[in-house]
């Protein structure tokens, strides 16, 4: 079962549940080949990974793993930040990793030293936090059963809620300028005006078929 995929250069990084993090060579899109698989401990579920330069940050049911993927055929574990009940996704900005933990809120981890990640702060969301995006000092958190919460994270030790968009099934989101695009597994795609962070406004929606749980915009 594949939970999520991210692409960097000629390689795709796939969170493959309890099969680990699979790194796939897609230099020839017609013939993708498995370059390697990283599995820390048998049974640990890998959900999502973000790759920056030669480092991969993987969200798992055992917390955050930081890997050296300079050689995609032989990933090497550098560090691990354990988290009870794990993390659903990971979002790294500068030297901070943000980890939505479903019903256990959001963890913020300093990853300046990949071999020694250090937890900086924590915010308990009122609902299941699945996905988030960070722009400057603002975090947008998709809370699956209640909507999107907007946080001021200028002080990482004490994030503060500044706005909320109520909706059912906010599974993922993407920020583009003053617009936020939200994928909802029940309601399709929603476009939200976030020019006023304290009062986000739904401006458009597309109720297509299927079960959208992720989104990318450009």
Predicted regions span which residues?
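Feature marking well-ordered beta-strand scaffolds used for ligand recognition
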Residues: 1-218
